[in-house]
């Protein structure tokens, strides 16, 4: 009954376009899943997990190389502005609550540490999305032939193809290197050796 105590109820700012990506990690999952847009939803709170009726939304585009950190910042700015607008509507009695379509719901569950390890057998796009979605936190890594870890902070899609085994470095440049994936080749642009800053 706590949610019923405030005169105007309780509201929440959620970093996704509900009912998609209910849960704890909506920003990361939007990028990992290759979404082209995300956004912020202001909703009424109820006893469910991000299931309350929606009061307003704002859409934020996700570009090819947008990272989780960049999207987080954009959502924060847009969400703060939207929250003020919704509060004004609630105070004026003009806010309209739209129930969520539960059949369209997807979930952004807690991130698992095992997800940080790059599986090069996936497509270049999937690996690129993971790297972007985990930058700056919790980050992604791969194991070198000597057993040491290498954090991967930046990548770019390419139009290259290779018959080399997934995970093989097929080409090096002055400021990057290219890795064969299960499908396609990914350019790695920023790394951090294990135990190095």
Feature annotation, model-predicted:
Residues 1-107:
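Donor/substrate-binding cores of folate-linked one-carbon enzymes
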Residues 20-22, 33-35, 90, 96-99, ...:
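A short linear-motif detector with a strong N-terminal bias
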Residues 109-121:
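Acyl-group handling in specialized metabolite and lipid biosynthesis
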Residues 121-197:
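An anion-binding loop in the catalytic cleft
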Residues 17, 69, 113-114, 189-190:
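Residues at structural and domain junctions
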């Amino acid at each position: 009954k706590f949610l019923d105590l405030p005169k105007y109820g309780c509201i929440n700012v959620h970093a996704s376009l509900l009912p998609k990506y209910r849960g704890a990690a909506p920003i990361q999952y939007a990028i990992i899943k290759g979404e082209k847009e995300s956004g912020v939803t202001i909703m009424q709170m109820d006893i469910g997990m991000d299931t309350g009726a929606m009061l307003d939304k704002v859409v934020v585009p996700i570009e090819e190389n947008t990272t989780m950190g960049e999207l987080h910042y954009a959502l924060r700015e847009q969400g703060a502005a939207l929250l003020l607008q919704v509060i004004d509507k609630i105070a004026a009695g003009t806010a309209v609550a739209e129930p969520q379509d539960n059949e369209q719901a997807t979930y952004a569950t807690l991130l698992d540490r095992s997800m940080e390890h790059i599986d090069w057998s996936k497509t270049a796009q999937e690996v690129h999305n993971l790297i972007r979605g985990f930058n700056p936190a919790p980050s992604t890594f791969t194991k070198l032939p000597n057993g040491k870890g290498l954090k991967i902070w930046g990548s770019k899609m390419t139009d290259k193809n290779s018959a080399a085994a997934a995970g093989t470095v097929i080409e090096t440049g002055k400021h990057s290197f290219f890795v064969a994936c299960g499908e396609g080749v990914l350019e790695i642009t920023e790394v951090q050796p294990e135990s190095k800053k």
